[in-house]
Swiss-Prot record:
<dbReference type="InterPro" id="IPR001753">
    <property type="entry name" value="Enoyl-CoA_hydra/iso"/>
</dbReference>
<keyword id="KW-0456">Lyase</keyword>
<comment type="similarity">
    <text>Belongs to the enoyl-CoA hydratase/isomerase family.</text>
</comment>
<dbReference type="InterPro" id="IPR018376">
    <property type="entry name" value="Enoyl-CoA_hyd/isom_CS"/>
</dbReference>
<dbReference type="InterPro" id="IPR029045">
    <property type="entry name" value="ClpP/crotonase-like_dom_sf"/>
</dbReference>
<protein>
    <recommendedName>
        <fullName>Putative enoyl-CoA hydratase/isomerase YngF</fullName>
    </recommendedName>
</protein>
<dbReference type="Pfam" id="PF00378">
    <property type="entry name" value="ECH_1"/>
</dbReference>
<dbReference type="GO" id="GO:0016829">
    <property type="term" value="F:lyase activity"/>
</dbReference>
<dbReference type="InterPro" id="IPR014748">
    <property type="entry name" value="Enoyl-CoA_hydra_C"/>
</dbReference>
<dbReference type="GO" id="GO:0006635">
    <property type="term" value="P:fatty acid beta-oxidation"/>
</dbReference>
Amino acid sequence: MGDSILFTVKNEHMALITLNRPQAANALSAEMLRNLQMIIQEIEFNSNIRCVILTGTGEKAFCAGADLKERIKLKEDQVLESVSLIQRTAALLDALPQPVIAAINGSALGGGLELALACDLRIATEAAVLGLPETGLAIIPGAGGTQRLPRLIGRGKAKEFIYTGRRVTAHEAKEIGLVEHVTAPCDLMPKAEELAAAISANGPIAVRQAKFAINKGLETDLATGLAIEQKAYEQTIPTKDRREGLQAFQEKRRAVYKGI
């Protein structure tokens, strides 16, 4: 698999994926994206993993987006395939049943920000800079940026963001709802792991169904969304974890969930 992507499982239920090309600002090469896809697919079918953290090596860059040194050598038809590779990777990340936290350790630009947008939650260091600068290169965001960003921060803000290609600081990103938390660099991973641990402590079937209901519900009208919510709720009723939650409440102890 090479070392462009690092993958570890921490504390049994927490997966950590690290983009590991610091010499290239963790830019997304084709090899790196294929490796990332393999890891995402491995996580998808591992019911023991309850939460995922995605971060980058170093303090300068989370991910600079597409590898432009690689891109400049491509023919026109190859460029589209290169963009599609990033888009498919982001889609796989978005579709994971487990919640994914982007721990943005530095600049997140272009396809790098689009990967973060495919995550459920985003935490950024104070020094991070975020942007979709593609229009400045006479192209557009092609890995979900034009679709996920307006769903997250609203149509008007997303249009300004993409049309101008301007970059925002971590604090401004928090103000507009692009990230949930901003930390000092030394606190980034502790905060991400704290959040992942809080998620992992809850009923894993319930968390997966909550993610499913939220994501699918946002794609449709309210009435259909409420029906999706009810179907998701039904999945939790016959579980042993639901009974464990009630028993733990009655006995005034912390519930121990097993995902069954």
